Design a protein with these regions (language model features):
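Flexible loop and strand-edge segments within Gram-negative outer membrane beta-barrel domains
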Residues: 7, 186-187, 194, 198-200, ...
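N-terminal periplasmic accessory domains that precede
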Residues: 11-13, 23, 45-53, 69-72, ...
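Short acidic/polar hinge/loop motifs at secondary-structure boundaries
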Residues: 89-118
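Outer-membrane beta-barrel translocator/receptor signature
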Residues: 108-112, 121-193, 200-206
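Transmembrane beta-barrel wall of Gram-negative outer-membrane proteins
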Residues: 159-185, 195-231, 242-260, 317-323, ...
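Surface-exposed extracellular loop regions of Gram-negative outer-membrane beta-barrel proteins
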Residues: 229-231, 271-275, 339, 344, ...
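Outer-membrane beta-barrel signature, preferentially recognizing the C-terminal barrel domain
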Residues: 238-258, 306, 361-367, 414-433, ...
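Gram-negative outer-membrane beta-barrel transporters
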Residues: 323, 380-382, 386, 394-395, ...
């Protein structure tokens, strides 16, 4: 039996997760397709992006404060992941990773989140750990009225937070427009022991507008504008806070869908500005004076702004070659300019002021990356499918000044103005329907990644987790991964299950290595480390998702995730979370909804002491939520109440820097009016 290429796209189960937040569908890996799944990911109307991603398969969060947590996927983080917004490349402007790309997005302006694991993420660029693509919300063309709007307000007692959400839109003829905005303000929260955690406050604004024009039934032209600004953001686990972090995104997209082919083209620009600030911290240090043998009192403050601008474009085309094959091609390019500065003001008490010391912690650099991605999907039968894809990226780094050369000359580096690297990837995916409810998948793959700007050109970057200064290495090799991933899926009307396991063998693994020759800069460091390629490492991960509905209105949802990592030196990989389990039980009856959640994690005793890790204890917390829907002729009012951390447990997770307790019991109240 032959299967057309059009049917391929409907029948085949891609090796990625797509969680659609508005359309209420979860793709491929586990096609749950019901509202309870959306409710599992979005625990309330004002769920932050951190709260949402923490509920995704394989995702953990590195926490430095109560805002802007850094996502980790199956043990991979930072430059090992592709994190994009509607396919657009974007990068944080903070050398301390205080502004991951996810921090500039709100769930209210998201349409869906797509996950791809391991090396099979070449559609978004060569990488080894996977990809997270956050698709921006589109105008609501399913509304019964040409004009629609919604207003939500809410508060959380643990941090006295204030949340306001507004969304509106208008459709007429061939034009569609949507607008949504969020305001959040949170005071320092209290942990489970009743202690207020200083420097855990934040305030932010986010607004997104989209316009779409439909010239005919097969074409669409869309424009997006997004602006996000956060102020007074505290980071209790770090020696500095953030006075201002803002981002702007502009995009123009054209899409055409025909029976035998589809084409999408996009051009975009985004800009990020980030300012670290220690003006509210205790900046008095006591330093031993080797000359006098006495202890000097030193007041030190630092100004640390960072800038990151990205211009990019891509074209994607998908063609039906014949009844069994569909070909997808993508050509893309982005140009990223980055610069991070530090001005250090030092004052030895009782002595004249010293002149400020200036350096560039990221030199003024422009990175230009051009890539080509090709993929073919073949249907051998209505039960067996194979996808083969490959990608090549060419990266050119161009230093814009001699500052980096002067700084690195101290370490006997003579830097050229230009560096180039070529990376490649190739991946296979086999999908076999053993029977109608059973699906088996197998994915072998290989990929490489280019070193990040921090790993390549970082200059005296202090890491508060292990207490070391870090310096980049301009001559790092590309990091490489050989991956194997298997999955088993089962689905019927009442019960659905997805089990996946992956194994990654890494070579030329990049990490900071102690260097006793180069002195550290900061008074309070344990020493200095230089980024180097180490021979190798291994990462194993297992994820289990299931949902069960024994009767109408009653739903059980479970997510279990586990990661194991080890260096070739037989030491544990640092920052690997222990086994974690999430369970949700919900019940719906007419306008009422009730839900109780449990989040538990085991003790993590596989730690790397050299990198500042300590054993983290196990924990288990419960959350409760209820809501009632008031229905009117043309509108609806939702009233939602909940208690998070029901038993006021004092706990922290293994990836939480500084072992600072998370929020204690909180009573939450939310109202949402939709017209």
């Amino acid at each position: 039996m032959t299967l057309s290429a059009q049917k391929i796209s409907k029948k085949i189960v891609c090796c990625c997760d797509t969680i659609a937040l508005k359309e209420i569908t979860v793709s491929s890996v586990i096609p749950l397709n019901n509202k309870q799944v959306e409710n599992f990911y979005k625990t309330n109307y004002f769920s932050t992006i951190d709260n949402l991603t923490a509920h995704l398969e394989g995702i953990s969060l590195i926490k430095r404060g109560s805002y802007a947590m850094e996502p980790q996927m199956n043990g991979f983080s930072g430059g090992q992941l592709n994190i994009t917004i509607s396919g657009m490349k974007m990068f944080g402007a903070c050398t301390d990773k205080m502004d991951p790309v996810t921090s500039y997005i709100e769930p209210s302006n998201l349409k869906s989140i797509t996950l791809e694991h391991g090396t099979n993420s070449g559609f978004y660029g060569n990488n080894i750990g996977g990809s997270i693509d956050m698709a921006l919300q589109e105008p609501n063309n399913n509304s019964k009225h040409s004009f629609y709007s919604a207003l939500s307000v809410g508060t959380e007692s643990v941090s006295n937070s204030k949340n306001i959400l507004l969304s509106t839109g208008y459709t007429k003829n061939k034009w569609e427009w949507g607008l949504n905005g969020v305001y959040r303000k949170s005071e320092p929260y209290k942990d489970g022991s009743g202690k207020t955690i200083p420097f855990s406050q934040f305030e932010k604004y986010n607004i997104h507008s989209v316009v779409r024009y439909l010239p005919d039934s097969t074409s669409a032209l869309k424009g997006d504008v997004l602006y996000d600004m956060a102020t007074n953001v505290g980071y209790p686990a770090l020696p500095m806070d953030v006075s201002n972090a803002r981002a702007s995104i502009f995009a123009l997209e054209y899409q055409r869908n025909q029976r035998n082919y589809t084409v999408k083209a996009k051009v975009y620009y985004n800009s990020v500005y980030h300012v670290m600030d220690d003006s509210h911290r205790d900046s008095l240090f006591f330093v031993h004076n080797k000359t006098t043998g006495k202890t000097d009192s030193v007041i030190m403050r630092m100004d640390m702004p960072g800038r990151c601008n990205t211009f990019g474009s891509f074209v994607v085309a998908s063609f039906r070659l014949n009844d069994k094959n569909r070909l997808t091609m993508k050509a893309d390019n982005y140009i990223n300019g980055s610069l991070a500065e530090m001005t250090m003001h030092m004052h030895f008490v009782g002595k004249p002021l010293e002149s400020p010391m200036y350096l560039q912690t990221w030199p003024d650099n422009v990175r230009n990356v051009t890539g080509l991605f090709i993929q073919n999907t073949t249907a051998f039968s209505d039960r067996l499918f194979m996808t083969l894809n490959g990608r090549v990226d060419y990266c050119l780094d161009h230093l814009q000044s001699d500052v980096a050369n002067r700084e690195f000359s101290v370490f006997n580096y003579n830097l050229p103005r230009k560096f180039d690297k070529l990376t490649k990837s190739v991946n296979l995916s086999f999908q076999y329907f053993i029977s109608q409810p059973f699906l088996f998948t197998f994915e072998p793959g290989y990929s490489e990644r280019i070193p990040t700007i921090t790993e390549k050109f970082g200059y005296y970057l202090y890491n508060a987790y292990d207490g070391y200064d870090y310096i980049g290495n301009p001559y790092l090799k590309t990091e490489k991964s050989f991956m194997g991933r298997v999955g088993m899926m089962y689905s019927n009307q009442r019960f659905k299950l997805n089990l996946s396991q992956s194994c990654n063998f890494l070579t030329d693994y990049i990490m900071g290595i102690n260097n006793s020759v180069i002195p550290p800069m900061n008074f309070y460091t344990n020493g200095l480390r230089v980024f180097q390629n180490v021979p190798g490492a291994k990462l194993l991960s297992t994820d289990l998702q299931s949902t069960y509905s024994p009767m109408d209105g009653l739903y059980f949802f479970n997510l279990t995730k586990f990661t194991w990592g080890r260096l070739d030196s037989d030491e544990p990989l640092p920052l690997i979370p222990p086994l974690k389990n999430l369970i949700s039980v919900s019940y719906e009856k007419r306008q009422w909804t009730f839900r109780i959640d449990n989040e538990s994690a085991l003790r993590q005793n596989r730690i790397n002491l050299q990198y500042g890790e300590t054993i983290s204890p196990s924990y288990s917390i419960f959350n409760f939520k209820s809501s009632y829907h008031f229905m009117f002729s043309d509108s609806m009012l939702d009233v939602s109440t909940g208690i998070t951390n029901l038993f006021n447990v004092a706990y922290y997770e293994h990836l939480d820097w500084g072992r600072i307790y998370r929020p204690g019991r909180s009573i939450d109240i939310f109202f949402k009016y939709t017209y």
